[in-house]
Curated annotation (Swiss-Prot):
It catalyses: Hydrolysis of terminal, non-reducing beta-D-glucosyl residues with release of beta-D-glucose. Residues 186-206 are annotated as: Disordered. Residues 188-198 have a biased composition (Gly residues). The active site is at D267. GO terms for molecular function: beta-glucosidase activity. Its main location: secreted. SMART domains: Fn3_like. Coiled coil: none annotated. This is Probable beta-glucosidase D. Beta-glucosidases are one of a number of cellulolytic enzymes involved in the degradation of cellulosic biomass. Catalyzes the last step releasing glucose from the inhibitory cellobiose. Glycans are attached at N66, N69, N186, N239, N301, N345, N443, N512, N534, N573, N588, N655, N745.
């Protein structure tokens, strides 16, 4: 996404309020209560009421406005969740998928606030994030690394916390990509995944109303509830209509049902018609399609109403006033190479969150490392890329792995690394302290040469034909580093890699303590070597940002006890996943709500590692399940229409609590997870995540964990009624350490009244 300039208010004079609108999707229509957005609405509508038509058109097309009401200067959008893109003296944070793997509300919020503060201090007003979609419908999706994972509940909480963090830093959150944007292939038509216009139509994501609400709209409810000020409509189609001119999506669902008060702006090439976009819900544009002269014509011939123009103008200013950018305190916008260092102490946060996100999937007492005498390191992912740290990474045409340490995304998800600590550097710093001898092959395929050699035990010469086997032999620990690359512009072509898997097996054949470390953009299969007797541990994570190597080494040596959890299921075979990349113009979401673990559970497919899985260096036990069931509830919500949907959806209607004890010898953090099974009549998945808490517990101590159930957590979408319905009947309660490791279970019964 490019930097876009549009209008912001630099001054406000006392003006009368604008009258309320009466058409669905217009602010103040259908009785949507704005709550704490009311002050922003009064300021924005008063300002717009004093503008001429030409000035309103200037406002929604990105031109400056000078009037008796005050002056407007450019407000900018910029990627993204991982930090400011293409700027000097900024931080490169973990990607959203890594942050979600912490399962830590505080960590998610803290990073968002830190990212937001860097945007604010560089003079940028809008973060193009949170990236609520791609959700992760298919593990082959090229951009799923940018989001919070395929579970709507986890994704929603993370989206909401991210929006709140940006707001508290003083900038406007702009969620993307709305809606059902789940792959790169054919996103611009003609089979391409690039950002340019291919000259033919993009694919259409076709989903039924139940799937739309229970899976893909769900995270946006959370983001809107927590103060979302902008939404980027996707460049693709939904149910046959382009997202940026889709009235059902923008006017009905987003602006009316969810009560979204902010502006909608298009992704690159998301606009194809000014009229269709304007009347159906888009509020801002800067392309030649959305020009002042075009909009004037639409007004003059009656195609575009004055009421809708006013609504667009007001919405362009809602987020600006909501986060108090009108107070004049934000620093002026800086050039990309300006020496304005906004990083503060964020490197510490990045390192901590990176370590929190790493999931220990397997451990045969190999970790933590205990001052190994000889350690060998393998894989390109362990060391730096030859030129760096920043390279212009255009994923289209790139290979499935990265020849260097992969710590940030590509395209819109590529952070500006001020430096990068690869594992090789972090390990070197550690072994100097410990007196360890380290050997390395920083490549995934190794061709020997007569000019390279290895000092071997029992000889005073060097081997003339060294190999992975030579380096692995006589090592106390062998660390094998793997990565998987994808990103904007192209989908994944594989979920495992032959070269890397051969490397693992070769090392393991010659080293009885082979530890595999993976940083990946999505599910990475490992059945090619996971059952090898000498593969003793697997550490698994996403892309961790500038402190990546330090975060990994903190876990390897036990300075941090691992607590990360999977946000996707790792299958045994590619064929175990039910959704592949769609190569046709019509992409039918026939799987419905059955993504990831929901599909595996429904079809009794045994995963290699389940959703929510992650080990620790200590052990935990669960006991004392207690359920405070909901009282009698109305079948449908009866609250007011509000920002974030019907106000009743957010009511706390019940609680589930358990005791978790640390039964091991080390302090550590556990992530107990709550899953619900709905009454049979609701026709829902076997289990759905409906609560989690990351709790730090000292050795020998215990903690009581309480999960609050909101009304929406026990509701499903009633298509005929077009409302969220609470089913009468028995709900099954499961609490455990993953979607398959369920320690405790119970039931509660809900009675509903009409």
């Amino acid at each position: 996404m490019k930097v876009l300039s549009f209008i912001v208010a630099a001054a406000l004079l006392g003006l009368t309020g604008a009258s309320s609108n009466s058409s669905p999707g217009l602010l103040k229509s259908d009785g949507v209560v704005l709550g704490d957005w009311e002050s922003a609405y009064q300021k924005a509508s008063s300002f717009v009421a004093g503008l001429t038509t030409d000035q309103k058109l200037a406002l929604i097309t990105g031109s400056s406005v000078n009037s008796t009401n005050g002056s407007f200067s450019g407000l900018t959008f910029l990627d993204g969740d991982m930090g400011l893109q293409n700027f000097f003296y900024v931080s490169a944070f973990s990607l959203s998928s890594a942050l979600a793997m912490t399962w830590d509300r505080d960590a998610i919020y803290a990073q968002a606030k830190a990212v937001g503060s860097e945007f604010y201090n560089k003079g940028i007003q809008v973060v193009a994030g949170p990236t609520s979609q791609p959700l992760g419908r298919t593990p082959w999706g090229g951009r799923i690394v940018e989001g919070f994972g395929p579970d709507p509940y986890l994704n929603g909480l993370a989206s909401g916390l991210t929006a709140k963090g940006y707001i508290d830093a003083g900038v406007i959150p702009g969620a993307k990509h709305f809606l059902l944007y789940e792959q790169e292939t054919n996103r611009t038509g003609g089979g391409g995944g690039g950002g340019g216009d291919s000259g033919s139509a993009p694919y259409s994501s076709n989903a039924d109303d139940k799937t739309l609400h229970e899976t893909y709209l769900w995270p946006f409810y959370d983001a809107v509830k927590h103060g979302l000020g902008a939404v980027m409509c996707a460049m693709t189609k939904v149910n046959g209509t382009l997202s940026c001119q889709n009235s059902d999506l923008l006017m009905k669902h987003l602006k009316t049902e969810l009560g979204f008060p902010g502006l909608v702006w298009p992704d690159t090439n998301g606009q194809s018609s000014a009229l269709e976009s304007a009347v159906n819900g888009e509020d801002y544009g800067s392309s030649s399609i959305w020009s002042t002269s075009t909009m004037e014509t639409l007004l003059s011939n009656g195609s575009l109403s004055e009421a809708r123009l006013d609504d667009m103008a007001v919405r362009n200013l809602m987020g600006y006033y909501y986060v108090n950018l009108d107070n004049g305190l934000q620093p002026e916008e800086q050039s990309e190479d300006a020496y304005v260092d906004v990083r503060g102490n964020h490197s510490k946060l990045i390192r901590e969150n990176g370590a929190k996100s790493m999931a220990l999937l397997k451990n045969k007492n190999a970790l933590p490392l205990r001052k190994p005498r000889v350690m060998s390191v393998f894989g390109a992912h362990a060391g730096p890329v030859l030129g760096g740290p920043n390279t212009a990474m255009d994923i289209e045409g790139s290979g499935p792995t990265y020849q260097g340490h992969l710590a940030t995304g590509t395209g819109s998800a590529q952070a500006s690394l001020p430096y990068l600590v690869p594992p090789y550097v972090a390990l070197t710093n550690r072994i100097i302290e410990d007196g360890t001898m380290m050997r390395w092959v920083l490549n995934d395929t190794y061709s020997s040469s007569s000019t390279s050699g290895l000092i071997t035990e029992g000889t005073d010469s060097t081997a003339v034909d060294p190999s992975f086997a030579d380096y692995a032999t006589n090592s106390d620990a062998c660390l094998v580093f793997l990565n998987a690359l994808s990103g904007e512009g192209a989908d994944r072509t594989e979920l495992y890699n032959d070269d890397q898997d051969t490397m693992v097996n070769t090392v393991a054949d010659n080293c009885n303590n082979t530890i595999v470390i993976i940083n990946t953009v999505g599910p990475r299969l490992m059945d090619q070597w996971i059952e090898h007797d000498n593969v003793t541990a697997v550490l698994y994570g996403s892309l961790l940002g500038q402190e990546s190597g330090n975060s990994i080494v903190d876990i390897l040596y036990g300075d941090v006890n691992p607590s990360g959890r999977l946000i996707h299921t790792i299958a045994k075979n590619e064929s175990d996943y039910n959704v592949k990349i769609c190569y046709t113009a019509q992409c039918n979401f026939t799987e419905g709500v059955y993504l990831d673990y929901r599909y595996f559970d429904a079809h009794n497919v045994t995963p290699r590692y389940p959703f929510g899985h992650g080990l620790s260096y200590t052990t935990f036990s669960y006991s004392d399940l207690n359920i405070e069931k909901p009282s009698t509830l109305s079948k449908y919500p009866t609250g007011e229409k509000a920002v974030g949907g019907n106000s009743d959806l957010w009511d706390i209607v019940g609680n589930v609590s358990v005791k978790v004890a640390n039964t091991g010898s080390l302090d550590g953090a556990e992530v107990p997870q709550l899953y619900l099974g709905f009454p049979t009549a609701a026709q829902q998945p076997v289990r759905q995540l409906r609560g989690f808490e990351r709790v730090e517990i000292a050795s020998g101590k215990q903690s009581q964990v309480t999960f609050q159930l909101r009304r929406r957590d026990i509701s499903y979408w009633d298509v005929p009624a077009q409302q969220w319905l609470v089913a009468s009947g028995d709900y099954k309660v499961y609490v455990g350490a993953s979607s398959r490791d369920l320690k405790l279970n119970g039931t509660f019964t809900v009675q509903t009244s009409s």
